[in-house]
A protein has these predicted regions:
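Zinc-dependent deaminase catalytic domain
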Residues: 1-141
């Protein structure tokens, strides 16, 4: 009897690649962010495709987000903007990693900023896979 003749056999027609799978996990983690404008998620995996850590952007742990501004009007003083309080997804994941990230890959929903790029490099991340880069057409890029 051939395998296909078995009534319990089914053929997988379509399966996610590892890159698709981990990017979907990063996208799901971004939904934990309370930021009304920008939701970013990240997932770090080792060379065996085991998840090491994940993160999303949000205020510093332990701070009541109702007390801080989510505004992003750069004409306002920094204390009235989210930028002085929000920890980026990559930084949150690195801070909560249970082990070394050396040699890992980072899947992130938004191209890392300069500060996060430095953290990624310093943590030994060997590859960054991003979903979008909303600043790619700006003059500073």
């Amino acid at each position: 009897m051939e395998l296909k003749d078995n009534p319990n056999y089914f053929e997988v027609k379509s399966m996610l690649t590892w890159d698709e799978y981990f990017m979907l996990q990063a996208m799901i983690s971004s939904f934990k962010s309370k930021d009304p404008a920008t939701k970013v998620g990240s997932v770090f995996v080792d060379e065996k495709n085991h998840q090491i850590t994940m993160g999303y952007n949000g205020f510093v742990a332990g701070i009541d987000e109702r007390l801080l501004p989510w505004g992003k009007d750069k004409s306002q003083p920094l204390e009235h903007q989210k930028y002085g309080y929000v920890v980026h997804s990559e930084a949150n994941a690195i801070l909560h990693a249970p082990r070394s990230l050396a040699g890992s890959r980072c899947y992130v929903t938004l191209f890392p900023c300069n500060e996060c790029a430095k953290l990624l490099a310093s943590s030994g991340v060997k590859e960054v896979i991003y979903l979008s880069d909303k600043h790619q057409d700006t003059e500073s890029n």
